[in-house]
């Protein structure tokens, strides 16, 4: 199962989303000036262990870089993922 290779911002839900078939991986976020606070990353149980959340995080960090933001990982998964991916360390606030 693959994602659509990009995340979109859902204004009503205040989150970034990426569909994987009929399932959705998302991150609840808050923006403050030049920071994106990643409060919670969710992947449905059916997608856990498939790499879907990792692909989502990669796309989300590309958005952070494009929008010239800094990421503040509040969520344990987001913090762990960022620690393991040195190519995104410049984006951590």
Please describe what each predicted stretch is.
Residues 41-48:
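A short, internal acetyl-CoA/4′-phosphopantetheine-binding micro-motif in the GNAT/acyltransferase core
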Residues 62-93:
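C-terminal structural segments of small proteins and small subunits
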Residues 32, 39-41, 74-77:
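Acidic/polar N-terminal loop/beta-strand segments that form early-domain functional surfaces
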Residues 1-36:
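N-terminal first-folded block
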Residues 38, 52-55, 73:
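Generic alpha-helix structural propensity
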Residues 49-62:
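Conserved acetyl-CoA-binding loop-helix of GNAT-fold acetyltransferases
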């Amino acid at each position: 199962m693959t994602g659509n290779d990009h995340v979109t911002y859902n204004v009503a839900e205040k989150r970034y989303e990426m569909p994987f078939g009929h399932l959705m991986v998302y991150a609840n976020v808050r923006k403050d000036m030049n920071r994106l606070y990643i409060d919670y990353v969710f992947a449905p149980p059916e997608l856990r262990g498939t790499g879907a959340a990792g692909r989502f995080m990669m796309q989300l960090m590309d958005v952070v870089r494009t929008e010239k933001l800094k990421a503040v990982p509040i969520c344990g998964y987001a913090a762990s993922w960022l620690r393991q991916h040195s190519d995104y360390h410049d984006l951590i606030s």
